[in-house]
């Protein structure tokens, strides 16, 4: 292994996203797949991670114990569920390993645990790791500053039938970007559901609508609607590889950061645009 390479460990190796992450790690220059993890009792334990992902034999077998592979990776990549991610986060903090977190659905306590851990280790935490989505978030900030005070703002998102949290983390990130640009607190202005006799739309609110159907990878639209015209800013993902490649790219970037909490805008240097 060349000194410039970083070794990554992939959580949830047998899942849809886990397999894509393995493919991305194996296909990206400067990266070595060091470990792959699955939950205790999984039928996939002992499988070759590369074969599991359809990328050929790698010699890296799927394990259930982080302790057993702690010397095999530099950066941990986790797109699982909040309770599992927080356990992995605690391990990484204890052992000085950076972590890339793509898990969504954290409550306030979980988000605080991530902030606390960032005092000791480097963390990239993002709702969406695609380059396109993060460019969209920057566009939303600019659109909100120009149009947000006098338009009705709605965010519509669609995902596959298996997604367990709603609204999506990306939809919430869109709302946060818009609210921040307008000096608002999203918790105070978000409307997550409408049913029955709701009365007229309350000015200054940000509405959310959710679709769960079929195999939709991810579609997000922000609408700025006025009387007579509206602007819609949309991102559509057709492959999870865009998220996987972004996450592995983040791991490479994170290797040089001893501690701190970052997101994709830092990785892509979007804050200077």
UniProtKB/Swiss-Prot annotation:
Enzyme class at the top of the EC tree: oxidoreductase
Organism field: Citrobacter koseri (strain ATCC BAA-895 / CDC 4225-83 / SGSC4696)
SUPFAM superfamilies: Glyceraldehyde-3-phosphate dehydrogenase-like, C-terminal domain, NAD(P)-binding Rossmann-fold domains
Family: Belongs to the DapB family.
Active-site feature positions: 159, 163
Any Gene Ontology CC annotation: cytosol
PROSITE patterns xrefs: DAPB
HAMAP family: DapB
Gene Ontology MF term list: 4-hydroxy-tetrahydrodipicolinate reductase; NAD binding; NADP binding; oxidoreductase activity, acting on CH or CH2 groups, NAD or NADP as acceptor
Record protein name field: 4-hydroxy-tetrahydrodipicolinate reductase
Chief localisation class: cytoplasm
Entry binding sites for NAD(+): 12-17, 38, 102-104, 126-129
């Amino acid at each position: 292994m060349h000194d410039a390479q970083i070794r990554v460990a992939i959580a949830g190796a047998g899942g849809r996203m886990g397999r894509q992450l393995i493919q991305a790690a194996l296909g990206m220059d400067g990266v070595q797949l060091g470990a792959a993890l699955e939950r205790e009792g999984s039928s996939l334990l002992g499988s070759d991670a590369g074969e599991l992902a359809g990328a050929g034999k790698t010699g890296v077998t799927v394990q259930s114990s982080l302790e057993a592979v702690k010397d095999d990776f530099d950066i941990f990549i986790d797109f699982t569920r909040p309770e599992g991610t927080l356990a992995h986060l605690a391990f990484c903090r204890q052992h000085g390993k950076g972590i890339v977190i793509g898990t969504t659905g954290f409550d306030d306590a979980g988000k605080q645990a991530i902030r606390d851990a960032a005092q000791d280790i480097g963390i990239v935490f993002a709702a969406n790791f695609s380059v396109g989505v993060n460019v969209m978030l920057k566009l939303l900030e600019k659109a909100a500053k120009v149009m947000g005070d006098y338009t009705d703002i709605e965010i519509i998102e669609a995902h596959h039938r298996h997604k367990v949290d709603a609204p999506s983390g990306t939809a919430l990130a869109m709302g946060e970007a818009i609210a921040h640009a307008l000096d608002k607190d999203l918790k105070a202005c978000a409307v997550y559901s409408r049913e029955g006799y709701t009365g007229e739309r309350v000015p200054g609110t940000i509405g959310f609508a959710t679709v769960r159907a079929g195999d939709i990878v991810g579609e997000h639209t922000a609408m700025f609607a006025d009387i007579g015209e509206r602007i819609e800013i949309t991102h559509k993902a057709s492959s999870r590889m865009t998220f996987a490649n972004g996450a592995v790219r983040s791991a490479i970037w994170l290797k040089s950061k001893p501690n701190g909490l970052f997101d994709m805008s830092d990785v892509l240097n979007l804050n200077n645009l």
